[in-house]
Structure formats: structure tokens, C-alpha cells
């Protein structure tokens, strides 16, 4: 290799011959990727930044342009499976913003293909398991419920011993003298299970829509849980979803007073959710060992969607057809005005 050749490379006049590149990499003791300045794997912080940048872009920029940018990033880092996974999560949270049903369907197929790519090539078993769940959500978005069930039922049998793994791990930590690890893991698991119960209960309210006794008992028990653990302060989004579903249910049961009560509680949760410009998950005085774990999540403590994006959904929430039953109620009108003030 002559000095003249190197000079031309440095000035971008010409490129090294392909056969020369591995020789140069060996000479300098680096990989070919390092020699070319190509980084096929991104760090957690880099992935998080890309996610947040694109999430904000969905809120303020052209949808099609943002999707094209995401596709370009995925092509460039196709073997960075955590990045590909997060881009699927991002698209799943925003694909309904596409202007036509055809574009939405195309995005669902694209996400499904990316999930298949991760599952086929990634060596990280935990990421592959998460990708299977993500693929099931994508299939459900496209109305492929039977296919989603085939994925989910295989991993959700309540009879399996794996359901006991959390408590067994805490016991193992204690027996090994790792009290700090036992405490950390117990808190994290309790926190996750609490919100899993609240979220599943919101789903159960839709199942119990024909059984008011079961509906009432579910609301009563979950409300007690919300109050005891001060869950509105911990995760206002999960609580708001539950209260909203309770309000809709009581409208179906023609109980306007109960519906208004839970609509008010729904707005209390929304007010907490919107109180900060960038709502973040966090612990409290009781869950005082989980903040570090939250920051280690793929997207840290921040919301998976930009504020402007989910505010649009909130703005339309009291326009559900069931709320027509309350359109002449003065209390409901005041609640509508409160919602408008919150999102302006």
C-alpha cells in the first residue's frame, strides 16, 4: 500500500480494494467493522435515545417520514436485536396513526417479519421470549386471534411450576445470605404483580359486563388495593385505564352515579399523568428499592409514547358512545370541561 493510495483514501477520492481491507485490519489489530467505523451493535442508552427521538417525531413530524427513518435505522442495525425489538415496540404503539387501513396492515406485517427475524437469529433467550409476546400483540392488532392464542397459551399455563419461580428465587437468595438481593427482587416482583393485577382486573371488567355482582366485587377489591398501595402516585396510567373501564361498565348497567364517580377518578389519574411534562415511572416510600431497576429497563422510566400522542387519545376518551347517556348531566359537563382544561 503506497502513501499515495492512503492519501486518496483519506481525501475520499478512492476506496481501498476489498481484498486489501482484511489485510489492513490485521495489520492494525482491529476488526473489519472497527476499521470501517461500522458499529453494528448499539448500547442501551443509544437505543433509548433513538426510541425517544422517533417517539417525539411521531408527535410533531410527518408519520410516513418517521416510519421511513425507522426502516432505514433497522436496515443499518439489522443484527442489533435489542434495537430491532424496540423499533417494533415503537411502531406497535404508533401504527394506528397511519392514514389508511392498508398502511396499518403493511406496518403490522413489517413488525411481524422483524419479530420472526429476531426469534430466528437472536441468541438471547429472554429477548426471544419477549419477542414472542410482542408478535402475539401484533397478530391481535391484525385480527389474527387464533394465531396469537397459539403463541400465548403455550407459555401461559397456570399449572406449570415456573409460576413459583419468583418466590423460590427470593427464598434462594435468603438461604444464600443475599438479603439485599432478596429484598430488591421481592419489591420489584410485588410492584409488577400489583400492576399486573390492576391491568388484568380492567380486562376482567369487560368479561364481567353481564354479571353486575362480579363487576361490583372486582371494582370494590381493586379500589381497596389502589388506595392501600397509593397506586395513582406510582402508575397513574394503569389506574386510569381501570377507572375508565369501570365508568363504561356502570353506564352499561345504567348506574349514572357510579359511572360519574369512576369518571371523576379517571380524570384524577389523568391529572396526575399530565402533571409532569414527561411522566415517569418511579417508586415511593414503600417501594424504595425499585428506581434503579426502572432505570435499567429498555426505555428507562419514560412513557413509551410521546406526551402529544397520548394526549390525543385522552382528548377523545369522553366521546365514547356510552357517555351519551350523561350528555345532559351537569356534573358530566363539568368533568368534560376539566378534561379540556387539562389537555390545553
Kindly give the residue locations of the regions a language model identified.
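Generic helix N-cap/helix-start motif at coil->alpha-helix transitions
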Residues: 44-50, 79-84, 95, 123-132, ...
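Alpha-helical protein-protein interaction modules
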Residues: 197-329, 333-334, 338-344
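Alpha-helical segment of the N-proximal tetratricopeptide repeat
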Residues: 45-76, 86, 93-102
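Recognition helix of helix-turn-helix/homeodomain-like DNA-binding domains
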Residues: 1-16, 37-41
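DNA major-groove recognition helix of helix-turn-helix/homeodomain DNA-binding modules
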Residues: 19-34
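Residue at a conserved register position within TPR or TPR-like alpha-solenoid repeats
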Residues: 57, 91, 98, 139, ...
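Alpha-helical repeat scaffolds
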Residues: 65-74, 102-121, 143-157, 179-192, ...
Amino acid at each position: 500500500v503506497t502513501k499515495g493510495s492512503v492519501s486518496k483514501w483519506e481525501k475520499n477520492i478512492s476506496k481501498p480494494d476489498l481484498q486489501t481491507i482484511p489485510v489492513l485490519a490485521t495489520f492494525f489489530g482491529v476488526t473489519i467493522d472497527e476499521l470501517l467505523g461500522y458499529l453494528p451493535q448499539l448500547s442501551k442508552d443509544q437505543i433509548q435515545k433513538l426510541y425517544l427521538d422517533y417517539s417525539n417525531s411521531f408527535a410533531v413530524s410527518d408519520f410516513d417520514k418517521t416510519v421511513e427513518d425507522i426502516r432505514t435505522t433497522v436496515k443499518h442495525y439489522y443484527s442489533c436485536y435489542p434495537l430491532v425489538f424496540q423499533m417494533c415496540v415503537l411502531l406497535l404503539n404508533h401504527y394506528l396513526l397511519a392514514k389508511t387501513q392498508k398502511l396499518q396492515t403493511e406496518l403490522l406485517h413489517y413488525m411481524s417479519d422483524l419479530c420472526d427475524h429476531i426469534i430466528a437469529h437472536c441468541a438471547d433467550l429472554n429477548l426471544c421470549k419477549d419477542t414472542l409476546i410482542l408478535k402475539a400483540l401484533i397478530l391481535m392488532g391484525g385480527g389474527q386471534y387464533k394465531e396469537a392464542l397459539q403463541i400465548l397459551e403455550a407459555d401461559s399455563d397456570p399449572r406449570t411450576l415456573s409460576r413459583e419461580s419468583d418466590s423460590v428465587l427470593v427464598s434462594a437468595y435468603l438461604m444464600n445470605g443475599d438479603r439485599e438481593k432478596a429484598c430488591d427482587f421481592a419489591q420489584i416482583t410485588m410492584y409488577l404483580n400489583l400492576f399486573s393485577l390492576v391491568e388484568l382486573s380492567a380486562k376482567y371488567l369487560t368479561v364481567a359486563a353481564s354479571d353486575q355482582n362480579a363487576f361490583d366485587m372486582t371494582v370494590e377489591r381493586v379500589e381497596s388495593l389502589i388506595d392501600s398501595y397509593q397506586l395513582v402516585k406510582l402508575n397513574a396510567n394503569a389506574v386510569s385505564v381501570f377507572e375508565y373501564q369501570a365508568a363504561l361498565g356502570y353506564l352499561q348497567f345504567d348506574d349514572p352515579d357510579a359511572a360519574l364517580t369512576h369518571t371523576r377518578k379517571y380524570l384524577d389519574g389523568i391529572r396526575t399523568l399530565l402533571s409532569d411534562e414527561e411522566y415517569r415511572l418511579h417508586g415511593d416510600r414503600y417501594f424504595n428499592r425499585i428506581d434503579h431497576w426502572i432505570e435499567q429497563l429498555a426505555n428507562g422510566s419514560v412513557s413509551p409514547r410521546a406526551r402529544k400522542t397520548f394526549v390525543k387519545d385522552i382528548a377523545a376518551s369522553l366521546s365514547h358512545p356510552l357517555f351519551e347517556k350523561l350528555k345532559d348531566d351537569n356534573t358530566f359537563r363539568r368533568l368534560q370541561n376539566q378534561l379540556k382544561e387539562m389537555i390545553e
